[in-house]
Amino acid sequence: MDIQQIVQRQHDYFATGATLDVKGRLAALDRLRAAIEKYEGEINAALKADLNKSPFETYMCEVGLVLNELSYIRKRTRRWARDKRVPTPLSQFKSVSFRHPEPYGVVLVMAPWNYPFMLAMEPVVGAIAAGNCVVMKPSAYSPATSAVMAKLVAETFDPRFFTVVEGGRAENQALLDQKFDYIFFTGGTTVAREVMAKAAKHLTPVSLELGGKSPCIVDETANIKVAAKRLAFGKFLNAGQTCEAPDYLFVHESVRDELVAELEKNVRAFFGEDPLACPDYVKIINDKHYQRIQGLIAGEHAVFGGQARDGRIAPTLLDGITGDSPIMQEEIFGPVLPMMTFEDLDQVIAFITSRPKPLALYLFTTDHDTERTVLERVSFGGGCVNDTIIHLATPYMPFGGVGNSGMGGYHGKYSFDTFTHYKSVLKKANWLDLPMRYQPYTDGNFKLLKMFLK
């Protein structure tokens, strides 16, 4: 069956109304949970093969997050799927107004390779809860994980309802040539532009979860020991292959040396004296990215790190960096942290705001005025004060970007809303019919109209 037939089969199935019943949605979420738990061993093995992820990191950053999202959404789907009563203006008396949630239809979820299980499955949870049919396209760069997900889904779901299309660029293009009712894409800006262009032909709404160069600021009031540990965690988790990882560092000149020493100490504590020999240290996804990252390091001064072998690059801190340095011209997506110092916060803000809006921003400070200044003057998707990356691991806030770092947000209720169209409905009583809206227009009715509409 070719891709056009796969997508049409889903449109035909959605048209039957089979996905509208909330009981059926809940049953589908339950089947997904059971399948993930059944396949957890194979998922672990696949992520070990693709990225050298340990079972601990796989559960913390992939499987556990999906199961948590399933639990949260499963408990609330029935309530979210009900009509929502809203007030009605006096001018429309006697009426009842409500918003009726309906699924978009057939949605395409395109996932990346860096967290290949979590970033594929979390959007799917929201799409299923909202009553959609789903076509999932995982990344060809993580083939073992893609294969396990395809097997899991094929064994668990009717392919008319939820199916996986494996493959590379040819399959991506073939999918984007089809008419979907919603497209959810996670990846880079280059492909995102292709997705938007293809979606525009059908006026298909999209969510774009992208990336960018996310700054981290450490000011002179920060708790340096805490900042260093949390910065090292957020930057070097998954070998820096995290879309919201700190991409570059601004540290106040007065605490620069202390922070550097603490960062190096924490890297040793996390990964040992030789991180490249650490069994739990994640590898770079492929040789193309391995060579690209080494090219960004070449010619720069490494305070620590810089070693590379067998597809791994050690956690690396660079100094002597300026805004014109090659490494500051693109998202790094690797375990390399360029560092710049500052004395004037206004200069840092001017630097960040002169560049495309980042997916995340991280600020380490104990000064409330500094916190408010940065949050109010810098636009970014989301972030943390006195921590890194953990803002994405909550169902109570949307995760997403702004500007070049993306559009739309998801997690928890925001995932349900992303894949839901809310129909605005007004139901009018028959026993009362105010006359002023009808022709012929009279002076008396005009006065009444002005009483209601002002």
Q: How would you label these PLM feature ranges?
A:
Residues 190-322, 345-346, 385, 453:
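ALDH superfamily catalytic-core signature
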Residues 217, 268, 309-454:
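Conserved C-terminal structural/oligomerization subdomain of aldehyde/semialdehyde dehydrogenase
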Residues 25, 70, 131, 162, ...:
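Residue-level signal for inorganic ion chemistry
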Residues 14, 18, 33-36, 40, ...:
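Structural signal for hydrophobic packing residues in well-ordered secondary-structure cores
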Residues 6-8, 207-210, 238-243, 274-276, ...:
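Short, flexible turn/loop "capping" segments at secondary-structure junctions
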Residues 90-226, 264:
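Rossmann-like NAD(P) dinucleotide-binding subdomain of oxidoreductase/dehydrogenase enzymes
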Residues 3, 22, 40, 224, ...:
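Residues at or immediately preceding the N-termini of alpha-helices
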Residues 1-98:
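N-terminal Rossmann-like NAD(P)+-binding subdomain of aldehyde/semialdehyde dehydrogenases
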